[in-house]
Amino acid sequence: IKQALRMIGENKLLSVISILGTALAICMIMVIVILYVVNTASFKPEVNRGRTCYITTVMSNGKDDNRRISYSSLGLPLVKECCYPLKGAEAVTAINMDRYRPLTASSMDGLKNRTSYISYTDTAFWKVFQFDFLQGGPFSPAAFTSGIRNAVISESVALALFGTDQVVGREMKLDFIVYNICGVVKDVSRFASKAWAEVWIPYTVRDDGGYQEGING
């Protein structure tokens, strides 16, 4: 130890550079490991990462020459015809989220509002992902099938609009359309990229389902 301290004292600049370089290398390794863990390990609400298959894009070829190729996200017709009927799957859910077009969530009097990211999904979503509900619960299968405008909101949205997380049964607006709040969940980490949103509503409330016709969406 004394010899090491003596060497550091003899060439302070080189010693500082060596120490900082070693510390930076260790920090970079730690960051890489942390990013790998948060993108692969299971944690709430994405507790089933290790046994979940994600289908995010589909490729289509031209019928005649097989040369015209296109890639896009899945359309609802393809999900209904090919994914929902899968017998080997414990649960199948469809998620439609426009990360580039958040909606304005507001109180009924319009005095409080918050730009929020919306996830359009189905009832199986709440089986695949495990959320911590502070009050209420997910929208029911009957509400989903009927296209009733129910919404599950995050704790931060509830606090921003109402000042409390005990808001089940109250109403709010999403881009001036009224929704009934059926559940409030703890805020979700953005690292849970598939489950993350700030408001979750049935995709059946949209006239077009949020998808194009056919296999593309």
Feature locations, PLM:
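A short amphipathic helical element positioned immediately N-terminal to and/or at the very start
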Residues: 1-9, 78, 82
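Short, strongly hydrophobic transmembrane alpha-helices
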Residues: 7, 11-41
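Short, conserved clusters of charged catalytic residues that mark active-site
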Residues: 15, 34, 38, 73-81, ...
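Membrane-proximal extracellular/periplasmic loop immediately following the first transmembrane helix
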Residues: 32-104, 112, 215-217
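Solvent-exposed, non-transmembrane alpha-helical starts
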Residues: 65-76, 111-116, 145-149, 188-200, ...
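Short strand-coil-strand connectors
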Residues: 103-110, 175-177
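Mid-to-C-terminal secondary-structure elements
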Residues: 122-139, 149-217
